Regions:
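Hydrophobic alpha-helical segments of integral membrane proteins
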Residues: 1-16
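Soluble cytosolic regulatory domains appended to membrane proteins
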Residues: 19-183
């Protein structure tokens, strides 16, 4: 009975003071890296596996602005562009998705997928506006992990990257993230 009374009173004091007790053992990132390093040295883990694990941890510290395709390298289509002009541009620069803008890149109208272009480009009354899809936007200072979560939950493979003023800074794709992990 005395031990029970002592335990109960100790728990009551802990609850009243707001202290939290934890019996869990928490493993840090550095401990995991050390275990992986030791496994690699012992031959239990391949170096390529160690490299991927380290890249996963490093990816958590990165922002999408550091892995995106910059706006200066971005191929985009003008909303009123002719079918012939689009065809030539796409032949030279094959991508899965193209931003579509009005007059300048910061005036995004939406995006168009390559497969939609193939399906409609030869139609006599082709208009880019007819096959537009809504664009997805991510702030450039968003973490890669957070972006990956959005890409996964929204079932999309890209996002246009904006600065704090809403200007387009580039595009990030699921492929960019995979390239950082495996590249």
């Amino acid at each position: 009975p005395f031990v029970w009374l002592l335990s109960a009173s100790t728990q009551a004091v802990i609850r009243l003071t707001g202290l939290h007790t934890s019996t869990e053992n928490k493993v840090t990132e550095e401990e995991i890296k050390a275990i992986i390093q030791e496994g690699t040295e012992d031959g239990e883990i391949q170096e390529v596996e160690q490299d991927i694990v380290e890249k996963v941890f490093n990816l958590g510290d990165r922002k999408i602005g550091s892995i995106m395709t910059h706006r200066s390298d971005l191929i985009w289509l003008e909303i009123g562009e002719s079918a012939e002009s689009i065809r030539n541009k796409v032949k030279e620069n094959v991508y899965t998705v193209y931003p579509v803008a009005h007059d300048e890149l910061d005036h995004i109208e939406g995006v168009v997928y390559l497969k939609d272009l193939f399906s409609h480009l030869d139609e006599p009354d082709f208009k880019l506006a007819d096959i537009l899809r809504p664009a997805q936007f991510f702030p450039e200072n968003q973490s890669v992990y957070n972006t990956l979560g959005h890409l996964k939950s929204d079932h999309i493979k890209y996002g246009l990257v904006t600065d704090e003023f809403g200007s387009i800074q580039g595009i990030v794709t699921l492929k960019d993230i995979v390239d950082v992990l495996l590249g």
